[in-house]
Amino acid sequence: MTSSASSTDVILPMQEPYMTQIVDGRKNYEFRKYRLKPSIKRVWFYRTAPHSSISHICEIAPAQTRNPGDTPLEETGLGNKEFNTRHQDWTSYDFAYKILSVYVIEKPLLLKDLRGKYGMKSAPRGFVYLPKAIFEQISWHKQKKIWQVG
């Protein structure tokens, strides 16, 4: 991470149907094979083709793990039971991030803008720290809130 990147926000690529499942609340955890830094509070989701844009921002809780003695996830969301039971399709997905809120960006950030305006060389393929220029120009909390926990 450079000083031109946010220490609290990351970009993660997301394919369909998973993005729709997050937006409509059926998927209430994001599962990853790696632990994000504890300072990360929000994920800006880059929707892959055909959307090719950052369209949603989610506030997240710190990582939950599935080590012996850990409290299992509530099994109300897609993938939660599989995470808890270590289903074979969930091998190595050892970190679960509870989605606390979902915001839709009123004017999605298109790939051409990410490249031209914000200096990203290509579409995000893995996790990327959010450029500070995006964080400073897009007020995440002023976007349209779709849902929030509690």
Per-region residue spans from a language model:
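Structured alpha/beta reader/binder surfaces that contact nucleic acids or chromatin modification marks
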Residues: 2-150
